[in-house]
């Protein structure tokens, strides 16, 4: 934190200096390299920042792609500030906020449709509800280090593979849209291993 102080103040704290850490909250995301974890750091200038123990290059590329997708559209896709420091990085803390008007809700869903399109193009397949934060009229995807999908099923032997085969070329594949399943994987596995 000390070595990145000036950049953090400039890029993540809108120029407001800090001298102390008030709080550190861990266990925010999946553990990375040898148990390293994501931390939310609360600073004495009123800002919170997110520490990630890995390169944020993928996140940077994703944000650049969102800029490209937004060109020529009525609205832009929401982004957040990233400070990639090589083997680790810092991010703006994205705080949830409500919409207050019907017009804001409409703009939110327009942008949400843009996100669905962008992630369909990337073949994204592992977004969870925790990855999507509503910031007023702007939906923002966070935690995107695994955003590019490379799991492809061309032949289905298991029920899981059959499901993937059916939805992998669909906007449902990203996980952004609700997908109601009448079959539980756990239930299927229990029957597959049961002896009769």
Place the predicted regions along the sequence by residue.
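Conserved ATP-binding subdomain of kinase catalytic cores across diverse folds
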Residues: 2-122
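Conserved kinase catalytic-core segment
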Residues: 92-183
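Conserved small/polar residues in nucleotide/adenosyl-binding loops
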Residues: 186-193
């Amino acid at each position: 934190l000390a070595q990145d102080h000036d950049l953090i103040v400039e890029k993540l704290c809108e120029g407001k200096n800090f001298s102390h850490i008030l709080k550190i909250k861990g266990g925010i995301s999946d553990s990375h390299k040898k148990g390293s974890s994501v931390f939310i750091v609360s600073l004495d200038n009123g800002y919170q920042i997110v520490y990630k123990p890995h390169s944020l290059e993928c996140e940077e590329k994703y944000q650049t792609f969102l800029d490209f997708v937004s060109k020529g559209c009525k609205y832009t896709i929401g982004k957040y500030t990233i400070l990639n420091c090589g083997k680790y990085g810092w991010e703006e803390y994205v705080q949830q906020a409500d919409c207050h008007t019907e017009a804001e809700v409409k703009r939110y869903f327009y942008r949400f449709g843009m996100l669905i399109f962008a992630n369909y193009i990337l073949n994204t397949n592992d977004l969870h509800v925790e990855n999507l934060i509503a910031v007023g009229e702007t939906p923002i995807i966070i935690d995107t280090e695994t955003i590019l999908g490379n799991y492809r099923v061309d032949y289905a032997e298991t029920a899981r593979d059959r499901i993937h085969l059916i939805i992998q070329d669909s906007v449902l594949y990203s996980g952004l849209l609700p997908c109601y399943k009448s079959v539980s994987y756990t239930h299927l596995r229990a029957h597959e291993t049961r002896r009769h």
